Amino acid sequence: MAALDKATILNTDDLPREELDIPEWGGSVFVRTMTGTERDAWEQSIVSGGKTDLTNIRARMCVRVLVDTEGNRIFDDTDAKQLGRKSSCALDRIFAAAQRLN
């Protein structure tokens, strides 16, 4: 394998997306790998006072990884509560893909 330089690393598109069928919603979604910064923010958001906060964890993860065809997030963190009211089967499928990609 070749040694990589700074420019190569920083210019590489290393955030793959996976299209996932969600029949409960009548279509498909794209799940994207998080950046290192996004992953750190996610991990920080689920730990409070030394304890893990699992409240609405699937929806909280889903809003961070669901993207459009260009890779841009389609939800804000503030949408997690509303998304959490959607099908647990759909959220489980997205959450599993997010875990696999991240």
What annotation goes with each model-predicted range?
Residues M1-P16:
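Extended acidic low-complexity intrinsically disordered regions
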Residues P16, E24-N102:
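Short, surface-exposed, charged amphipathic helix/loop patches that serve as local interaction elements
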